[in-house]
Every structure is written in C-alpha cells, then in structure tokens.
Amino acid sequence: MGKVYLVGAGPGAPDLLTLRAARILAAADIVLHDALVHPDTLKLAAHARFIDVGKRYGKVSTEQRFIHRALIEAARTHDVVVRLKGGDPMIFGRAQEELDALREAGIETEVVPGVTAALAAASTLQVSLTRRGIARTVTFLTPRVGRGETVSGTDHNSMPDVLCPPWLPAALSADTVVLYMAAGAGREIAQALIDGGKPSSTPVALVESATLPEEQRRITTLGELARATLARAEGPVVVCVGEVFRDALDELQLDSNPDAAPNELHRQVHR
C-alpha cells in the first residue's frame, strides 16, 4: 500500500513551489493534478504517470467521487501518489473530503502546503492584507455553491453553481475580504456588498492568474465595479476588498485609455 501526498502547487508560477513539494514530485509514481497546475510544475515529476482530475467553473469537471476512487486505486498499486492541487490544498481545495476517503480506506496521507491565491494576489499588488490601524481581520471565502451542496440549511441541488447569499455576513464583518472562484461574478459581488452596507467608495482589486506572465490586475471601487463591463476571464480570479487597497487605488490608474467608455474596465497586463 502506497502513501498519498496532497501537495499544494502554489498560485501558478512553478518557482513558488516549496522545496518539499518539489522533492515529493520528483519521487512520484503517479500524479493526479488539477487543471490549473503549470506544465513546468508537472515536469518535476519526470517519471510519473499523470491523470488530469481538474475542476473549472463553467467547464466539464471531474466528479469528486471519481477522484476519491482514483486516489485509492493509485495507492494500492503505487508507492508514491501525489494529489497535486493549485494553491494550498486546505483552502477551498476539497482536501478534507479526499483525506477522509483515503483514511477510511486505510491509506497513509500527508499534506504539503502551498502558497494560496489570496497571498499571491497580495504579493503581486504589494499590498498587505493586514495593516496596523486599518485591517486586523481577514476573511477568505467563496460566493459559489456547487450542485447538491447545503449552506446554512439551504439545499442547492437544483442549481449547478450559484452565488449564495450566506457569504455576505462574513464579508461585511471583516476588514479585508478575499473572494475565491470569483470569475464572472465581480459585478454581482460588488453590488451585494454595497446592498449589504459597504460604502461604494470601498477599494477593490481583481487579480487574474496571479504570478503568471499573463497576470492581470484591476484596481477600482465597489461602485465602479458594480457598473463595469468586464472582459471574460481566462484564468482564476480573486476579488480583494478593503481599505488596505486605498493607496493602490490612488496610485494605479484603472484606465490608461482616455477615450474609453467610462463604464468599461479595461485589462491591464503586467509581465
């Protein structure tokens, strides 16, 4: 019987992988990886077999129960099994479900942490999520609820993926909020926060594909975001809200094109 390692691949850039993660990948016999793991990260597992078990919002995704079965089967036939997850396995990675399934099957497990998207976004923006006198609390959350998931007593079995109101109180009570899996939902998130009592002047930063060459950043306010027309995001997006981004809002010009329509957020590409 082999051992399964739940390994965090970090936010995207391969050189943000931890040394332990790189060592385990090099020894891997089989790697079950997320869709967003960088190809150069996979190259570290030079002798491994690969299985793509990725999940992407709005696209065909691997069912969780299949992932559980595949991990158990892999552990029965291989010594070193790696479940490679984007970011950190323990942040919105369904790691607990996989750990529980593996433990129930009597399989040894280990978790190797990775850099989560919220911290990658803060680093690329060069804005601390906490700041003396401004932000003492930080909340990570996702507004999305998957099919069949129950949140606060509400069964969403009939809805494939929704913006679920129970996230709002947590977002309103924190000084800084980072919303994961927010692609395509920026306007709705901004309007919900405003309706909940957040000032429309509150700074908000959107970071897509943090740490990668195609990374894109947008700095604006909740009010502007609620009215904006956003281009379709190709990569993962986090939405960061709070007064800690005030200086970034003052320093960065949202739109470099003076002839652009005022209600349109234009992409800023940083390489």
Segments and roles (model prediction):
Residues 2-4, 76-81, 145-271:
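A contiguous loop/helix-start segment that scaffolds small-molecule binding in enzyme catalytic cores
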Residues 49-55, 108-110, 129-136, 197-206:
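Short hydrophobic/aromatic-enriched beta-strand-loop microsegments
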